[in-house]
């Protein structure tokens, strides 16, 4: 008799667990606004809705969000092993944009995918953004006010390859009125200063040749403020501040500086700018000066 009651109790527990699981795993709905796919330059755009493996990866991620998100910010990662190659996914959930709940999904499979969804009622997720790049690029997403207008924006940063120090940051400004993201703004080796509404950074190119730059958010757009280049006449001991973009500026094209302005000293890539090579010929210096002489601008 005790065995009968024990078996009955086990059945009740199993039924209760299944019932609870059913409550937790509600069927979700995924909607998509009319959005433009954005991608890295060397990656072909694709429609992930026709790829069953990618659909599984994204659906699994959003299903987890639907179960776990209770209104508090949430960040976690997991391995999705039902695909080959195995997918690693990082999920961030919170009231990131306009105090509304959003999900950022960063997943690696055959490509690197970053998607943004707005969480709506009745287990519904509405896609607002889609980015794709090579799986070899470790694209990092972050959310902050890039242009100093008091509204959070989406940033995607990845480390480039090669000898020219190419580390781009893509900025997508969020518009709370339309709940959409802007076209991509690209900055090289950038540091952001939202309180000043300024971006400062180091250009991509040969060390000791490339310049510093500063852009300011004015009237709804990024406006170039100045460039600072090593002064080739003094072998990089001094610098030239100019409004003209381009290596090896002449002194008459700008202001001669005896030192780098303090506002640039904290840039994370400043060391690349300072690597001036005095032991060998600077790249394309002779050609640049000859061309300038021919144009009568020396």
What are these regions (language model features)?
Residues 1-4, 19:
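Positively charged n-region of N-terminal signal peptides that target proteins for export
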Residues 14-16:
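C-terminal motif of bacterial Sec signal peptides marking the signal peptidase cleavage site
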Residues 60-82, 118-136, 177-191, 195-203, ...:
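Blade-edge motifs of beta-propeller repeat domains
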Residues 97-105, 147-158, 197-201:
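Acidic/hydrophobic-patterned starts of short beta strands in beta-sheet-rich repeat architectures
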